[in-house]
Amino acid sequence: MGEEHMDVWMLNRKILPNDLLDIFSALGNLQAQYDWVITDHSMWYGKNCPEAVCKRCQRAGLLMTGRELTEHLRAGYVWFLDGAVLSAVPLGMREEDVNLYEPVWDVDFCAPDYRFQTPLTRLELILFDGWAWVIVCNAAFSKLVQSRLPQAQPPDAFWKAFG
């Protein structure tokens, strides 16, 4: 995405009864519009989680379709715990295309020179310390966040609320 400016939005996880599914739903079933590279994640696995799903989700640099991610979340198979980076990449992405890049994730998502973890990424959802979801996106997508997730705040306002 080059040198494009990124906007950052933050949401307290406690205000989202269905967690990540609420973000997806508010943003027009966002998960179905992309495939997802999931890295730096810690997950809880439900008692009903099939062994194959547990093993798959334990991989680093996991590539998953939005449909599959939604199914696992809705079924209660998985839940993100302390952290995760979910990078939206174009639909139909092949795992070998994703593996061409070593994920480079920058903790300072508010930095003016923040870069997505791969050049294929269109937006990122970051679970910050287990209690806040962060949306990093371009200005056009930012307008959608503002209109459909009014509880999302820019980082300065978000941190001030915890002041």
Give the label of every model feature segment.
Residues 14-70:
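N-terminal interaction modules that seed assembly of large macromolecular complexes
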Residues 14-16, 41, 91, 128-130, ...:
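Generic structural motif
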Residues 8-11:
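Asparagine-biased alpha-helical interface segments
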Residues 35, 61, 76, 149-150:
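Short, flexible coil/linker elements and helix-boundary hinge sites characteristic
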Residues 49-125:
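Surface-exposed, low-hydrophobicity interaction/linker segments
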Residues 4, 113-163:
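Acidic, proline/glycine-rich low-complexity IDRs
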Residues 32-43, 81-86, 117-119, 158-162:
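Short glycine-rich, low-complexity/disordered patches
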